[in-house]
Curated annotation (Swiss-Prot):
Gene: gatZ
GO biological process assignments: D-tagatose 6-phosphate catabolic process; galactitol metabolic process; phosphoenolpyruvate-dependent sugar phosphotransferase system
HAMAP family: Tagatose_aldol_GatZ
Protein name: D-tagatose-1,6-bisphosphate aldolase subunit GatZ
Assigned keywords, A-Z: Galactitol metabolism
Cellular component, GO annotation: plasma membrane
Family: Belongs to the GatZ/KbaZ family. GatZ subfamily.
Pfam family, one: GatZ_KbaZ-like
Stored PANTHER family: D-TAGATOSE-1,6-BISPHOSPHATE ALDOLASE SUBUNIT GATZ, N-ACETYLGALACTOSAMINE PERMEASE II COMPONENT-RELATED
Amino acid sequence: MKTLIARHKAGEHIGICSVCSAHPLVIEAALAFDRNSTRKVLIEATSNQVNQFGGYTGMTPADFREFVFTIADKVGFARERIILGGDHLGPNCWQQENADAAMEKSVELVKEYVRAGFSKIHLDASMSCAGDPIPLAPETVAERAAVLCFAAESVATDCQREQLSYVIGTEVPVPGGEASAIQSVHITHVEDAANTLRTHQKAFIARGLTEALTRVIAIVVQPGVEFDHSNIIHYQPQEAQPLAQWIENTRMVYEAHSTDYQTRTAYWELVRDHFAILKVGPALTFALREAIFALAQIEQELIAPENRSGCLAVIEEVMLDEPQYWKKYYRTGFNDSLLDIRYSLSDRIRYYWPHSRIKNSVDTMMVNLEGVDIPLGMISQYLPKQFERIQSGELSAIPHQLIMDKIYDVLRAYRYGCAE
């Protein structure tokens, strides 16, 4: 990361896409996409997804590392080309507890990430805990971030410190996506970004972390990009120019969250304006969902009724029976809920892919389709971009490859924006 940031600060148009997903097919796609390049791939886990208690994936940081490395070995991607990151590391999961208890868990969280070899650490203590004022004072946020940084430094080996990098600050939306419809978005003011940097510098120095400050590579801000279930707020470069100009006088770049669904031109403009770390998550699993839905429609027409997976019906049944991952985010009317379950841009289906019933139905569908020749006309109907690549000889009409290429479509846009 440090080399990439140095190149950007030296005037090169270079950025990096941060893949924020624990889905094995998404991780496989991210690694396979860059297998034949010289680029490194940044894969990040969030604190609610992966933590010392397992998170919602059931994985600790060490488990996640091995999970990613196993996929890398299968793909033929060198492990040393993978950068592992931890996103929103702090009290996010334990906000209902008092600050002392939440921070104690957060300290252990950060230590486990660093011990497991994660080298990009987002120190985010911006969340109010039980009994805290809302919002927290910037000084409190910075002091807690310094506590977390101290924890990271305390377990890092000398070798790790050479690679270790920190990200500070936070964007406006909560981790995991917007819970309601958005009309506009608040772009971070330069004064607020400067205050974030100033308060963190002061807090780090007070804890004897002056050297660690040199490892702070980025600050998270809101550049004016966001999405909800059916709306996308697109990047307006002119609105972010004050931020772009301010960061030029520092050693850092910006990290932009929720950059999903922007245009490839927007990604290029974001990187030009020093938002050099572009995080993406739901757009990748949304592309995965689109591919699975398309293949499910193809299966409906090609496979005898008694052998079909019933994949789409199974997904719907499970999500309606177990609504905990979408209920507070989606609309309440039955028809509206179904539309959101299937097609929301926030893609909360992503939490359900590991469910045994859904996984088994998708596996059945894949086996069914691997045993037949999919007519080109059907691929043109349901996966038109993939049809074009089959025609040009870039792609085969194999279900797994079709899913991979659908995810590649998202990664292609980021590659354009981050181009070296």
